[in-house]
């Protein structure tokens, strides 16, 4: 429990994810710290996934909307998309955001944390495939699951 005096210190020093990314970007631009380059470039995309999860938004719907495409994609995203054979989907915002999140995880998480998250993701995929026949005729969901599995496999 926080004492009365420490509660104020906690409130003054707490930073949400959006502010953290802004600070990392500011710090990277000012000092050129190479270890923060990926966080600066890809943090905003990962923020979209974080916010969707925090607010219980559905990620797998409306992924391939024509009006939901990015005109410009970071070179790191393009390289990763080529590696996992999803290059033609890299400009879709949700695919781009998911790739951003996983590239950041590979760059900044320990092997043990990566393994833990990979197992959790694989468990989710197994749960999704349990009722695969229910959505087998939904082309968008089926395509997203294929793309999602390819992206996650690189962890």
Model-derived regions: residue spans:
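Polyanionic, low-complexity intrinsically disordered segments
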Residues: 19-44, 48, 58-155
């Amino acid at each position: 429990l926080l004492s009365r005096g420490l509660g104020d210190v906690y409130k003054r020093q707490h930073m949400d994810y959006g502010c953290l990314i802004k600070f990392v970007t500011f710090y990277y631009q000012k000092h050129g710290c190479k270890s923060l380059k990926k966080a600066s470039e890809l943090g905003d995309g990962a923020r979209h996934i974080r916010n969707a999860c925090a607010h219980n938004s559905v990620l797998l719907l409306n992924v391939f909307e024509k009006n939901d495409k990015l005109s410009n994609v970071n070179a790191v995203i393009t390289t990763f998309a080529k590696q996992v054979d999803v290059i033609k989907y890299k400009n879709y915002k949700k695919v781009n955001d998911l790739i951003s999140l996983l590239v950041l995880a590979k760059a900044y998480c320990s092997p043990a944390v990566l393994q833990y998250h990979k197992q959790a993701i694989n468990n989710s995929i197994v749960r999704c495939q349990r009722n695969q026949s229910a959505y087998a005729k939904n082309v968008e969901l089926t395509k997203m699951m294929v793309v999602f599995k390819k992206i996650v496999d690189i962890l």
